[in-house]
Every structure is written in structure tokens, then in C-alpha cells.
Amino acid sequence: MSEAKSEMYYSLLEWFKTLNLSAAHNNAEELADGLALAQALNQFAADFFTDSWLAKIKASAVGSNWRLRMSNLKKVTQSLYDYYSEVMNYTLSDFVRPDLQLIAEKCDQVELERLLQLVLGCAVNCAKKQSYITEIMGLEEELQANIMRALQELESTGLVAGERSPSSSASGGAGSGGAVNSLSRNSLSVKALQEERDAMAQKCFETEKKMLLLLDEKTNLQQELQKIQQEFARLEINTTAIGDDGVSLGPVQAGSVRFNEMRRQLDLLKEELLQSEGAREDLKLKAVQQESDLVHMQQRIDELLKSSAEVTTLKDEVDVLRESNDKLKICEAQLDTYKKKLEDYNDLKKQIKILEERSADYVQQNAQFEDDAKRYANTKGQIELFKKEIQDLHSKLDIESGKNVKLEFDNKNLESKNLALQRAKESLVKERDNLRETVDELKCGHLTNNSGLTGCVEGTTMSRELQPTAMMDKIQRLEAENKALREGQGGQTALAQLLDDANKRCEHLRDQLKSANERILSLSHASQSDDPILKENEFAKQIKQLMELNEQKTLQLEEAVTQNASYQSKVIQLETSLSSREQEILACDAKYRKCVQKAKEIIKNIDPHIANAIDASALEKNMVDVVDEESKPKMSVMEEQLMTTAFYRLGVNAQRDAVDSKLAILMGSGQTFLARQRQSAPRKSLSAMKSK
């Protein structure tokens, strides 16, 4: 068995040497790097084993680096198995996979023979198989027999076609199976006939040798007979003869010694002649028999040649049947795919109708959205102008509010003085009533009454002068303008709500600022008073209130920071969801384009007239509009939310900065060092908040 395997390996190697390759391929060491095998596969099927695949095979995998050789062999073997499964629809489950490590390390001939066997199967099943088969037929008969045995082994190890469709398994399977069985029987009969032909040719050669020897003997005997006849004639002519002793024996007469001697010699020669004639007849019979055998052998050889020609025709027919069977399988598979594609096409038609209806609605929505976008673009510049005007008005309002607070504080002080004077007046009136009895006391009471009246009149006049009528008119006018601006912003409801919230916070902060200014003025007034006990009590109350206010401010600041962090996290989440949505839209777009391309191919394959009638570009445009319209409302909602949050953050930060700066200005002027130290530090600027 090992000898047969080695013969098969050398036969496959001799066949592989006939290929025209640039790489060396004369022995196992040169084939172990896989480069020659890859070039051969590229020559067999260039459409599958492409030049880019061939470039992956490293030409430097020679010498002692067996790992590079093994990497090349792995690529070649994997591509071979893929070719058998994908192109030829064959499975190699029962075929023993070649051990690539033995080939790479030791150049094992048995494993290399399996690999060459797979390459041979690829050669006889490729598009140029006829030329390779003729090259194989041009080799020696022994090599042809070994190559045929290798192909039969490849077929007998389970090299079967892949799964057939149910419709073609009855017809195509029976035809191909019968053709393969007839081919195997014919190949076996051809082998037997070839062996018988070789044996008969050997016999003919041996008989020809024997016949030549017998003919040589015949010619020798004829020459000897001629010599004897010539000698006999010469002896008959010579009447006198000389004996051995030189004495004449006399004439040849009956009864003489010479006559008897010659008679005896003649009898011996006749016997020899009869024997030679018998041998000649035997040789003639043998020659006739050999000629008849030779003619019979020639007839058998002609019959064998005819049978071999029939076998070749049968092989060609089997190849044609195989190709037709493969084409039938491919056509059936294509038919099934076309049926599925036709069903998909009908579904796509229905979907296209639905999408066209949707697209009409989306076009209307898109037009509305474009009008809204134009209106928004027009109002955006106005909003910026209004923002600047609002900031200027806020600054003016803060200045006026500070003045108003001072005036109100002065008014309260004057009112308190007025109340004190009224109380003093009442007490003086009571004293006047009590001290009316005496004239001196009446005069003194009258004088004091006049001074109280003058002080009251002066206080009333001062209080009337200190009333902020212009300031109140200006504040009302500013509020009316602010309200008109809010109403004039159109459909910007979210921004209006944010502005209202900001205004409410601003009013709340103004109230707090007002109370703080009142406390500051009261503290300054208390500091100017002379009573130390009242001063200490008021200082303690004010310090306590300021500490509470500071704690409230810090809590509000922490809440604002946490709210800002939550807004930032929401913005990040929205950005990530937006990016994922864009990726989904891109994937859907690519999938849609593939579906449209498949639909075009199906329509072209079914009916090219219908394919020409359909406007694929319009369909694609409608689908793209549908996808855009589906994604646009969601994006507009996201943008609106992001804009509202950004505007809210900007307004809050700007309001905080403005309040802090005003507090710092109001608290820093006209205060003592200790009073300034008790105040809370201003918040960070907007740029610092943004940087965080």
C-alpha cells in the first residue's frame, strides 16, 4: 500500500511539473512553501484565487522558517476548501485534511500527496479543464492510471455535491449518479483491457523473438544443405578420389568401400534433412499460429482503442452532464431567490405606496416647518436686540431700585421721626392742658407747641418731597414695556415662561436686596446713634439675620450648582442620543439603498420594459424625503429643548452676576471694615461657570 501511495505521489508530482509556473516545483521541498501551489490555483481559477489573494502568499517562506511555510499552506488549504464548497458545491467532510505541520516541517510526502490530490480535483473541474485533461492524457500510461486512481479516491471519500433543491433532486441526481457509476465501471474495464493489452504485447514480442531465432536456424540449415549438395555433386563428378593415406580409392562403384561410405553419409544427411524439414514445418505452423495470434491481438488492440475512445466520449458526456447539472442547480437556486425577491418586490410596492402617502403629508409638514424656521430666523435678531435692551433696562432698573431703596429708607426714618414728634405733640398737648393754670407754663407750652408744629410741618413737607413719584412712573413704564416685549415674541412660549421665571427671581432678589439695604442703612444709623446697648442689640440681630441670609444664599448657590450639573448631564445625554440617532439614520439609509438596488436588479431580471418605465431616482428621492421628515420633528424638539435650557442657564447666570456685582458695589461703599467682612462673597463669573 505504501508503494502504491508513493507511486501516486510521484505521478501527481510529475503531472504538477508539467504546469507552467514561475516558482520552483520539482520536489517536495520546493512545494512545501505553498507558493507554487498558490500560483497553480491562480492559473486554474483566477476569478476565485485572485491576484490580491496571491499577493498574501509570502514568497520569503523558504529555508528553516517553517512557520511562514505553514502560514502559506493554511491560506492555500482554506481557499481550496472554500472553492470546493462555494464554487463546486462539494463537501469534503470525509476527506482526510492534510497535516500542514508535517508538510512545513518534514516535507511529508503522504500529506503533500493529499494536498496535490485536492489541487488535481480543482484542475479537472475548473473552466480550462479540457486542456488540463488533454495534458494528463499525454502522459505515460502508468502515470495516467495513478492520476485516475487519485481522482477515484477523491470521489470515493465522500466528495458529493451539496444539497439540491427538492424539485431537481429526482432528475439531476439520478442522471449524475448514473453517469458517475458508468464512468467508474468504464474506467475499471479500461484498466483491465490495458493490462490485458500489455500482456498480449509482451507475448507477441516473445513469439517474434522465437520466430526470428527459428528463421535464423532455418537459413543456417538451408546453407548447410546447399553446402552438402555441392559437396555431393563435386564428389560425384570426381571419379577418382584419394583416401586418407593418399592412395586412390578408384571409381565409385556399387559395393565399393567408397560407395558404401558415401551411401552411409547420404542416409545420415537424408535423416538430418527430414528432421530439418519437420522442424521447418513445425516452425511454419508456429509462425502461422503466431501470425493469427498477432492479428487477434491487433483486433483486440483496435477494440481497446475504440473502447478508450468511447470512454473519453463518455467522460466528456459526464463532464457535460455535470456542468448541466451544476447549471441546473444554479438556475433552480436563482429561481428560488427570484421568487423570494418577487415577493419582497410586492411587499416593497405596498410599502412604497404607504410611504408615498406619508411623504405627501411630510412634504406639507416640511413646508410648515420651513415657514416656522423663516419666522424664527427673522425673530432671532429681534430677540437679540430685545435681550440687549432688557439688560440695559435691568441695569437702569437696578440703579433706580437702589435709589428707591435709599429714598424709602429715608422716608421710613422720617416717618418714624414724625411719629415720635406726633407722640411728643400729644404729650405736650396733655401737658398744655394740665399746665394751663399758670401763665408762665402756658407761655412755655405755647412756645413748645409752636416749635412742634413747625417741626411737623417741616417733616410733612420733607416726606412729601421724598415720595418717589418719578421712580414709580419709570418702573411702571419699564414693566409695561417688558410686558409688551413678552407679548410681541409670538409663539416663543418657552422663552416667555423662562423670562417670567427670571423676572420673578429678579423681583425676589430685588426684595432681598432691598431688605439687605434697609438692614445696612439701619445698621449704619444704629452705629451713628449714641446708645451702646441698643447698638449691640441691633448689631446682634443684624448679624444673626445676615448669617441666616448667608446660609440661604449658600444653599441657593449649591442648589443652582447641582441644577447646573444636572442640566449638563442632560445635555450630554441628549448629545449622545442625537449621535446614536444619526448613526441609526445612516444605517437605515444604507440599508434602504441596498434594498432599492436589489429591487432594480429584480425588476430588470423579470421584465426590462418595466424596469425602464420605473423612475428609480424619484423613488429614492421620495424615500430620502420620508426619512428626513421622520427624523426632522424629533430633531426640532431636541433643538428647542436644548435652546430653552441654554437660554435658561444664560439668564440665571447673568442675573446672578448682575445681582452679585450690585451687592458688592452697594455693600462696599460707606461701610466699615467689619461690616464688609460680614458680607457674603460674590458668586463666580459666567465664564468660570461655563468652564466647569
Curated annotation (Swiss-Prot):
InterPro entries reported for this sequence: CH_dom, CH_dom_sf, Hook_C, HOOK_N
Domain notes per entry: The coiled coil domain mediates homodimerization.
Coiled-coil positions: 135-576
Family: Belongs to the hook family.
Species name: Drosophila willistoni (Fruit fly)
Name the UniProt record assigns to this protein: Protein hook
Quaternary structure, from the entry: Homodimer. Interacts with microtubules via its N-terminus.
Coarse class of the protein's main subcellular location: cytoplasm
Function: Involved in endocytic trafficking by stabilizing organelles of the endocytic pathway. Probably acts as a cytoskeletal linker protein required to tether endosome vesicles to the cytoskeleton. Involved in modulation of endocytosis at stages required for down-regulation of membrane proteins that control synapse size. Not involved in synaptic vesicle recycling. Required in R7 cells for boss endocytosis into multivesicular bodies (MVBs). Has a role in regulating adult longevity.
